[in-house]
Structures are given as structure tokens and as C-alpha cells.
Amino acid sequence: MEYALTADHHRVHAFDAEKGQEYYCPVCGNQVIPRQGEVNSWHFAHVTSCMDDWKYDMSEWHRGWQSRFPENVREIVVEHRGECHRADILMGGYVIEFQHSPISAGEFERRNKFYTRAGYKVIWVFDESYAFGNEYISSSLDDENKFVWKWPNRVLASVVPQRSTDIAVVLQLTEDHDDDGCEWLVKVEW
């Protein structure tokens, strides 16, 4: 995690953490320590395990997406009926989750249920640039605004089509930018 709390509940970024100070997990309240090495990105790590059983491994792709949003909406704790989890982005009734690493269909569904029951709409951004780059995803011959997925992501292939307005799935298909500097994102519709 990039953010922790001080003893007086101020949010601190790992870059601003000082050695010897005490910091706490915003989800479980357990003590965390700053990891400020030269190999991995600076972050906080639990001294003992966290009660939050969701995995939060963050790649550079993930961090890059989070850094495009204001700090005050990143890694925000969502609490619902005694259960707490950390949203990548929480902004105006929306949770945005960035997914670079594999996630099971069960975990995908579990997270969606938690956030929607807590009253939020969920937007997932999946990194599928490898699939597009390897031509596993290609433009449809019938409609250039649609794509054909030769070997779809197992999680997305197993998900029942979303008929809800509470959940949206977006794919990043390439790291190229258009003339406006925007990433090439495509909303998934079943």
C-alpha cells in the first residue's frame, strides 16, 4: 500500500514516511512499516498479517493508473457492515479498480458484490495490452468499433454478462496514445 495512517490519523504517502515513526494500516489498524528500498516501489508493509484478505499487489502499470488521480481519492477504505477493504480509487459514488495481475472469477464477483452492496458503482480497468499486441484481440471485420477476442481472459469469459448499470469493465488494449495523449480504452459489452 502506498498510504498509511499516523497515530493521529493523518494519511501519509510512502515517499513522505520517516524511519522510526509509527504508521498504521487504514483498513485493519495494525502497524505497518515503510519499505523504501532501491528495487521495489516505495510502499508500506504490515508487521503482522492484515485482516483484509484481498490481495493488493501493485505493479508499475497499476501505480501509473492510480497516479493519474488526486491523492485524496486513492486507496480509500470502504466499510460496509463491519467489513473493510481498500478501493484503488473512490470518487463520487464510483469505485475504480485496476487489474493487471490475474484474478479469479470468484474474487471478481466477491469484490463487485461488496462494493455494490456498499452503494457504489464499480469500474474495472483490465490491462489486456499483451492480448492486443499478440493479436489475440483484433478489430472486427464487420464493425471497426468492435473487437474479436481469440482467447479471452478467463475471468471475463466466465463472468455472466452484466445487465446491471452498477458494474462496468474497461480494457486497456495498447500502451500507445492517440493524438490527445489518451490511452486506448475499450468498454466491454456482452
Q: Predicted regions span which residues?
A:
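Active-site metal-binding core of divalent-cation-utilizing nuclease and nuclease-like domains
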Residues: 12-17, 24, 29-34, 60-110, ...
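Short phosphate-binding/catalytic loops that engage adenosine nucleotides
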Residues: 119-120
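Anion (oxyanion) recognition and catalysis
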Residues: 116
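Non-catalytic C-terminal interaction segments of nucleic acid-processing enzymes
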Residues: 1-24, 132-190
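Cysteine-rich micro-motifs
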Residues: 22, 26, 39-52
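Short gly/ser-rich anion-binding loops that grip negatively charged ligand groups
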Residues: 51-55, 98
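Short cysteine/histidine-rich zinc-coordinating motifs and their immediately flanking basic loops
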Residues: 36-43, 58-62
